[in-house]
Amino acid sequence: MARVTLRITGTQLLCQDEHPSLLAALESHNVAVEYQCREGYCGSCRTRLVAGQVDWIAEPLAFIQPGEILPCCCRAKGDIEIEM
C-alpha cells in the first residue's frame, strides 16, 4: 500500500493493491483527473511527479517530459507526491 500526497491540497490518499493504476486509485478517492484513453496514448492525464517513484504498467506512448507521469499507465512505487 502506497501513500499518495496531492501537493496542491496536501491531501493524502492510500493506493490499494487492487487498484490497477494510479488513475484508478485517484478515482476511487473521488479525485477528478482529466483523461481520455486510459492507456498512455493521449497524455490528457499528464501530471508532475514531485517526489517518489512509479512503476510503469505499460510504456507511455504520449510524450512526457522528465519528471512527468501518466497516472493511467503507472502505479505508485512506495509513497509519492504529485502535482494535483
Swiss-Prot record:
UniProt GO MF annotations: 2 iron, 2 sulfur cluster binding; electron transfer activity; metal ion binding
A Pfam family this chain is assigned to: Fer2
Binding site for [2Fe-2S] cluster: 37, 42, 45, 74
BP GO annotations: ferredoxin metabolic process; protein repair
Keyword field: 2Fe-2S, Electron transport, Iron, Iron-sulfur, Metal-binding, Transport
Cofactors: [2Fe-2S] cluster
SUPFAM superfamilies the record matches: 2Fe-2S ferredoxin-like (SSF54292)
Record text on cofactor binding: Binds 1 [2Fe-2S] cluster.
Domain 2Fe-2S ferredoxin-type: 2-84
GO cellular component term, pick one: cytoplasm
Protein name: Uncharacterized ferredoxin-like protein YfaE
